[in-house]
């Protein structure tokens, strides 16, 4: 068997396959379907400083080769997570990573400070696609300045591995990635969902209550792959690739394009055991091509 281990900052993953936030609950929900310890890292549901109800229904819609979601970061807040969720997941022997969201820089900072004290959470992933309510609702992640502001503030209080999740809804994602790196990020993950919309022609109304939502699934893969390739060339920190990964071949393509690790999202809804199948598929690919380590294929695309 090939060596599948990779490093993301101070984080060591047994293999490069992770779960994307919002598609795998808190991990425990899937333990009857898959051996959680065979997953490189589990990124749990998005967590905010305070309780959030989420958006009204309908907030999910099927699209050709994908889906739209507008769940709205529904969660019970970080204090609830610490008191009720953390005790249930601290015994899972893999990297448990918390996705952190906020509507103001102070929200991110306070949430990160609280999570920093949890021994069995070795990393956080900042979702900077959230709107900044103090700046007219523009998402932090659509400008280098907005990205720098929140990443620097969190870096000042968070002492473990810091991953920054980038929005694809920008003109030049490399500019945002470089800003994250310069502000102290240990890694960047991309892409978050693409802004999309669905219409019910018979009712002449939007399908989603919020009109627009985040698009994910196989249809977004070419865009995600292109952005991962661009960012991997632009920064010197590990890149985590996601967006439309439905099987092992997709994962290998992302790694050839420069991703050190990958995340699986929408595919978890189709096959709860897809993560382990993908890691096994990567191993088979390495052995067929004579590689002894997965590191040998990172950025090995010949152009």
UniProtKB/Swiss-Prot annotation:
A Gene Ontology BP annotation from the UniProt entry: 'de novo' pyrimidine nucleobase biosynthetic process
Organism, scientific name: Phocaeicola vulgatus (strain ATCC 8482 / DSM 1447 / JCM 5826 / CCUG 4940 / NBRC 14291 / NCTC 11154) (Bacteroides vulgatus)
Matches recorded under InterPro entries: Aldolase_TIM (IPR013785), DHO_dehydrogenase (IPR050074), DHOD_1B (IPR033888), Dihydroorotate_DH_1 (IPR024920), Dihydroorotate_DH_1_2 (IPR012135), Dihydroorotate_DH_cat (IPR005720), Dihydroorotate_DH_CS (IPR001295), Dihydroorotate_DH_I (IPR049622)
Q: Which residues bind substrate?
A: 45, 69-73, 127, 192-193
Q: Which UniProt keywords apply?
A: Cytoplasm, Flavoprotein, FMN, NAD, Oxidoreductase, Pyrimidine biosynthesis
Work out whether the entry's keyword set contains NAD.
yes
Q: Name one GO cellular component term.
A: cytoplasm
Protein name per its UniProtKB record: Dihydroorotate dehydrogenase B (NAD(+)), catalytic subunit
Q: Which gene encodes it?
A: pyrD
Write out the annotated subcellular location.
Answer: Cytoplasm
Signal peptide region: none
Task: Please give the function described in this protein's UniProt entry.
Answer: Catalyzes the conversion of dihydroorotate to orotate with NAD(+) as electron acceptor.
Which Pfam families does this UniProt record tie to the protein? Answer: DHO_dh
| Residues the entry annotates as binding FMN | 21, 45-46, 99, 127, 165, 191, 217, 243-244, 265-266
């Amino acid at each position: 068997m090939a060596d599948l281990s990779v490093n993301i900052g101070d984080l060591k993953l047994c293999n490069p396959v992770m779960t994307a936030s919002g598609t795998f609950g808190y991990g425990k929900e899937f333990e009857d379907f898959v051996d959680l310890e065979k997953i490189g890292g589990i990124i749990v549901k998005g967590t905010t400083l305070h309780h959030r109800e989420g958006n009204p229904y309908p907030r999910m819609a099927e699209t050709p080769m994908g889906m739209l979601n507008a769940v709205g970061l529904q969660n019970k807040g970080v204090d609830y997570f610490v008191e009720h969720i953390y005790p249930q997941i601290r015994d899972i022997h893999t990297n448990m990573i918390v996705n952190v969201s906020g509507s103001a820089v102070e929200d991110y900072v306070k949430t990160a400070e609280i999570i920093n004290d949890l021994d069995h959470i070795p990393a956080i992933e900042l979702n900077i696609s959230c709107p900044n309510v103090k700046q007219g609702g523009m998402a932090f992640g659509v400008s280098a300045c907005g990205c720098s502001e929140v990443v620097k503030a969190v870096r000042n209080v968070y002492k473990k591995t810091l991953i920054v999740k980038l929005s694809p809804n920008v003109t030049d994602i490399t500019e945002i990635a470089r800003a994250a790196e310069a502000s102290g990020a240990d890694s960047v993950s991309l892409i978050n969902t693409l802004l999309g919309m669905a219409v019910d022609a018979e009712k002449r109304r939007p399908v989603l209550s919020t009109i627009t939502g985040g698009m994910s699934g196989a249809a977004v893969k070419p865009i995600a792959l292109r952005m991962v390739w661009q960012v991997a060339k632009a920064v010197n920190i590990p890149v985590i690739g996601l967006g439309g990964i439905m099987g092992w071949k997709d994962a290998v393509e992302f790694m050839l394009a420069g991703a050190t690790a990958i995340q699986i999202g929408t595919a978890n809804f189709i096959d709860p055991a897809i993560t382990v199948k993908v890691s096994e598929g990567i191993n088979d690919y390495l052995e067929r091509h004579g590689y002894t380590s997965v590191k040998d294929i990172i950025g090995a695309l010949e152009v």
